Swiss-Prot record:
This is N-acetyldiaminopimelate deacetylase. HAMAP family: DapEL. Pathway: Amino-acid biosynthesis; L-lysine biosynthesis via DAP pathway; LL-2,6-diaminopimelate from (S)-tetrahydrodipicolinate (acetylase route): step 3/3. Belongs to the peptidase M20A family. N-acetyldiaminopimelate deacetylase subfamily. It comes from Priestia megaterium (strain ATCC 12872 / QMB1551) (Bacillus megaterium). It holds the Pfam family Peptidase_M20. It catalyses: N-acetyl-(2S,6S)-2,6-diaminopimelate + H2O = (2S,6S)-2,6-diaminopimelate + acetate. The active site is at residues 69, 128. The keyword Amino-acid biosynthesis applies.
Amino acid sequence: MAENEFVKIRRELHKIPELGFQEVKTQRFLLDYINTLPQERLEVKTWKTGLFVKVHGTNPTKTIGYRADIDGLPITEETNYSFQSQHEGLMHACGHDMHMAIGLGVLTYFAQHEIKDNVLFIFQPAEEGPGGAQPMLQSDIMKEWLPDFIFALHVAPEYPVGSIALKEGLLFANTSELFIDLKGKGGHAAYPHTTNDMVVAACQLVSQLQTIVARNVDPLDSAVITVGKIQGGTVQNIIAERARIEGTIRTLSPESMTRVKERIEAIVKGVEVGYQCETAIDYGCMYHQVYNHHEVTREFMEFAKEQTDVDVIECKEAMTGEDFGYMLKDIPGFMFWLGVQSEYGLHHAKLQPHEGAIDIAISLITKYFEHKGNQ
């Protein structure tokens, strides 16, 4: 294909962002493209709205896995791209369109060129929620085609084009959503003594939650509790019967996640008693930490440093969440950041990753597969 063909593919995918487990058009686009490739060594299996694509090696002794996530976000795009999202209120604001284009680029090469070992491409739905990695990992297809090691990348607006960033060990945090519902007794604003005001209770709860990181988490560990949304009440002269708090929890260790949740539950119970209300906690979508296995990560870093067109940066761990962590929990492998140099960050309505990173990533991964898959 022409050198810029995968930029065109990225732009077509950018037009059709879809939420988790709703990626029907995306799956159809991927299948239609894959069907144009030589089929002699390819085997394709669908899973919900995702795909497994196996490239059969000529004399395989192992299977190498590459995962690309495929879902978009509920964000109204503000890029002014000529290829802006055609789905109102949805956007590829986390670079998954780039991830897919890169995956298709590498897949195209190995559909056309022999490799000794098997290569498994996993196009995974629902990374942004409710989480596709864990159920995909537990699927019969994955059990049948289980790779011996696996890796993935994620675009990074803060790093320049031509760079990748990674480290051995912990890369991304443990993450959990947080939803807290409060129900009290509403009433007229002139008679507060006859009510249990859930706006006041919610405000008290938000303040108390912020003490957890400061006083209940080891200072040498890290945790973040973010309350991003509060809902309560209906109009200005009615005391609110209900309130809802929505946020996230992020910790660098599983032990801290357990401790933080224990403290949240204790504090919520205290608010329930103090404000004579009913409460409910839902942790929603929870992701395991991304932990890069030392040996394979070190080997990849050494390989990448030998490439003249890639700058390898050893980064620090981040409080980002990624359900690829579930795959790395069961399969040796790693994840790395791909520099895409954008003024705006991930999950921003104006994110514009530099498309020059697509060919750089395709080249690096193709060379690495040839290195690993022909040993």
